[in-house]
C-alpha cells in the first residue's frame, strides 16, 4: 500500500495489472509479503518496470536490493531467454526463496543472485547495464545513484522505488518507525533531476518510481 495514493485508485491499478497478467507464483509471493509485512513493489509497479524494460530492449538488469525476487520476476520476463538479471540481498534466506519462486515461474535461468551488500555486488560486476534498479534501505539511495550513473548505457534506465515515500518527500517529515530516511530520498531525487545526462520523471504509481533515461 502506498499510504498516500487513494486506496480505490491503487486497488484499481492492481486489479488491472492482474487482469493483464496472472501467475500463481505471484499470488504466493504477494501472500508472503502480506503475512510478513515484507515490502514488495506490487503488481501495478511490477507491470510498469516490465514495460519500461521491454520498451528499451533491456537484456541486462542490475538490482540493488532484491528481497525474495518479486521485482526480479518482472525484469526476468522482460529480458527474455538469454537475458540476465543480477540480484543482490544481504539475507541468504531471501536468495533461497527467490530461487524457489523464480524456478517455479520458469525464469531462474535468467537470474544470478549475489548474497551480500548491494554495492559490493555491483562493483564485482563488469561493464554497463541496460537498467539499474534500486530498492535498498533509503539512506543508501544517493550512494547507489553515484555508483550506477556512469554504468548505465546511453539509452538505458535508472529505476528507483519509493521515491515519493508516502508523501514525506513533499513535507520533509519522516515516517515514525524510520526516522532520518526522508532526507536521503529527497537528496537522491534532486541528484537525478540535476544530472544533465539523464531525462527523468517520477511515476506516481504506488509509492513512486523514479525513471531516468540516460541520453548522453
Identify what each model region corresponds to.
Residues 1-131, 138-159, 163-216:
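A short alpha-helical cap/connector motif
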Amino acid at each position: 500500500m502506498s499510504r498516500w495514493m487513494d486506496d480505490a485508485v491503487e486497488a484499481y491499478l492492481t486489479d488491472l495489472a492482474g487482469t493483464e497478467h496472472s501467475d500463481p507464483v505471484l499470488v504466493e509471493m504477494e501472500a508472503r509479503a502480506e503475512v510478513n509485512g515484507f515490502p514488495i513493489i506490487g503488481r501495478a509497479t511490477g507491470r510498469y518496470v516490465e514495460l519500461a524494460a521491454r520498451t528499451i530492449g533491456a537484456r541486462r538488469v542490475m538490482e540493488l536490493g532484491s528481497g525474495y525476487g518479486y521485482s526480479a520476476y518482472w525484469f526476468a520476463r522482460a529480458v527474455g531467454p538469454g537475458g540476465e538479471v543480477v540480484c543482490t540481498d544481504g539475507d541468504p534466506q531471501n536468495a533461497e526463496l527467490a530461487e524457489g519462486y523464480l524456478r517455479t515461474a520458469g525464469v531462474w535461468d535468467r537470474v544470478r543472485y549475489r548474497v551480500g551488500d548491494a554495492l559490493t555486488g555491483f562493483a564485482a560486476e563488469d561493464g554497463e547495464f541496460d537498467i539499474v534498479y534500486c530498492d535498498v534501505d533509503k539512506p543508501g539511495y544517493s550512494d547507489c545513484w553515484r555508483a550506477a550513473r556512469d554504468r548505465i548505457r546511453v539509452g538505458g534506465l535508472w529505476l528507483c522505488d519509493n521515491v515519493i515515500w508516502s508523501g514525506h518527500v513533499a513535507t520533509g517529515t519522516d515516517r515514525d518507525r524510520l526516522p532520518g530516511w526522508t532526507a536521503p530520498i529527497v537528496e537522491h531525487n534532486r541528484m537525478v533531476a540535476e544530472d544533465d545526462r539523464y531525462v527523468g520523471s517520477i511515476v506516481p504509481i504506488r509509492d513512486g518510481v523514479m525513471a531516468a533515461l540516460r541520453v548522453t
